A protein has these predicted regions:
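A generic structural signal for secondary-structure junctions
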Residues: 1, 103, 158-159
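ABC transporter nucleotide-binding domains
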Residues: 1-72, 76-85
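Short, surface-exposed beta-strand/loop "edge" segments at domain boundaries and coil↔beta transitions
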Residues: 32-36, 111-115, 138-142
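ABC transporter nucleotide-binding domain
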Residues: 50-134
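C-terminal coupling/interaction segments
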Residues: 121-163
Length: 163
């Protein structure tokens, strides 16, 4: 829905993004590399772009490498999530497995001491105990775990025991 009569430099950011993708695909691109492709777009245009990306990825010969701070976009389109902080890769995991591999629990300080330190990714210390991001497979049965969001996982990986 781009206007042929409108001057390109007068296009909105969303229109320019649509044009950029059309140009990339006109070259029969098999890989798209996008940096903050949906940043600054209104929700309607953002959804259109994400739908376009999902359609593009239906062909197994197509790949998209997308850098984004909008985690809801990654939730919608990513198969794998790589998390890079200060130039260091903290994890690369299939999106669907990411939430299954980790859990959040709240334990007393005594209960935390009984956990294998290798199980703990990060912690928030409170007056009543600690909230932990843990590796599910290293936590004993009986500890109640909640599914973390991708944002939770990223925050705990970066903040660790600093909070």
């Amino acid at each position: 829905n781009l206007s042929e009569k409108q001057v390109v430099k007068s296009y909105s950011r969303g229109m320019r993004m649509k044009l950029s993708m059309a140009v990339a695909l006109s070259h029969n691109a098999e890989i798209l590399i996008l940096d903050e492709a949906t940043s600054g777009l209104d929700p309607i245009v953002r959804e259109e772009i994400l739908d376009f990306l999902l359609d593009f990825m239906q062909d197994e010969n197509h790949t998209i490498l997308i850098s984004s701070h909008i985690l809801s976009d990654l939730e919608k389109v990513a198969d794998y999530i790589a998390f890079i902080n200060d130039g260091k890769v903290l994890f690369v995991e299939p999106k669907d497995e990411l939430k299954e591999n980790y859990g959040i629990c709240t334990l007393s300080n005594e209960e935390v001491e009984n956990l294998d330190e290798e199980a703990i990714i990060g912690r928030r210390i409170h007056s009543f105990g600690q909230e932990l991001l843990v590796k599910r497979n290293l936590v004993p049965d009986g500890i109640r775990l909640q599914k973390p969001s991708i944002e939770d996982i990223m925050i705990y990986f970066v903040k660790g025991g600093k909070r």
